[in-house]
Amino acid sequence: MKFTLQHKDPSSQARAGELQTDHGVVKTPIFMPVGTAATVKGIFHRDVRDEARAQIILANTYHLYLRPGMDILERAGGVHRFSTWEGPMLTDSGGFQVFSLAACRKLKEEGCHFRSHIDGSKHLFTPESMMAFDECPPGDSPRDYAAKSLALTERWLDRCFNRYRQTSPKYGHYQALFPIVQGCTYPDLRARAAENVKQYDADGYAIGGLAVGEPTDVMYEMIEVVNAILPEDRPRYLMGVGTPINILEGIARGVDMFDCVMPTRNGRNGQIFTSEGTINIRNKKWEDDFSPIDPEGTAFVDHVYTKAYLHHLTICQEMLGAQIASLHNIAFYLRLVTEARDFTPWKERMVAKLGRRL
């Protein structure tokens, strides 16, 4: 994998670049739609690629490990062949899922013992996996716990990289490994973590453990602390973030890659992100609004369907409503990061618009 930094914004830390992988080229900054179970929920891969214009998607190690399981994936020839997604794909570590299942997991030096949320069966995740396995502590964790958690994540990272360097490319394709910077909301722990991951000379670096309950301004501060230390010539991935405004603020602070379930999950529940602001399509005011969903949108659904029709589908809980909303929102996120390649003046105008509730 090769990352080329093509342009830096003179008025912020925003960057434009290009990521070359065995499965294709990704232009940054980029948003990666979340395909937890090797599918972006409710949307054909064709539409994710051609209508939303996604260049890379994300799949989830935890969920795919449990179902369909490693045996099926290996017999299929890997996640790409199993799912028929031909472009680049990022698989996360499962660390956040372990965090979210805190009631049924136990952390030890060897790894994380947990019970499946599907059938209660017992499992063990060790650091010898992609991405680097980490603990994701809550945003309000006491300092002592955050420091102890970070130390465990750092020891796990060392084991992870040792295994990674001994592993041949699977299915004939190179796999890149991104270390994950933790440290909760403590600037000195974040700085220590960023300095530690630099020693591995990785293909890219991830910033984890944010947007887990801490105030937004604290999240932005942690991004600034970390990106001041991470190498400029490698991509930076902010995990699980976030709203359109969060993404623009992340770009302004030097982040290159983002993922979040918000455009699909919130879309299924009636929240529509548009170039003029955010819509709750369930509200009665849209019942007889026959204007397009988003006149500035890039997906066919933005121009073919009206707000009134989407309101009707959402109220009736029709599957098509969730599909239209999800595709629109993903296309909006992708358009947002594409236009952000020409950044500062445009960003200020967009943040003002995105804060509106229509």
Segment roles from a protein language model:
Residues 1-18, 26-32, 41-42, 136-142, ...:
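C-terminal extensions of enzymes
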Residues 1-170, 284-287:
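Non-catalytic, usually N-terminal nucleic-acid engagement modules in DNA/RNA processing proteins
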Residues 24, 57, 92, 179, ...:
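Conserved, mostly hydrophobic/aromatic
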Residues 24, 153-160, 197, 226, ...:
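Hydrophobic alpha-helical packing residues
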Residues 69-76, 267-281, 334, 343-348:
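C-terminal helical cap(s) of enzyme catalytic domains, especially alpha/beta-barrels
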Residues 129, 149, 153-156, 160, ...:
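Alpha-helical packing segments of well-folded alpha/beta enzyme cores
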Residues 151, 163, 167, 172-293:
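Glycine-rich phosphate/ribose-binding loops and adjacent secondary-structure elements
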Residues 158, 162-165, 228-231, 315, ...:
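Generic secondary-structure signature for well-ordered alpha-helical cores
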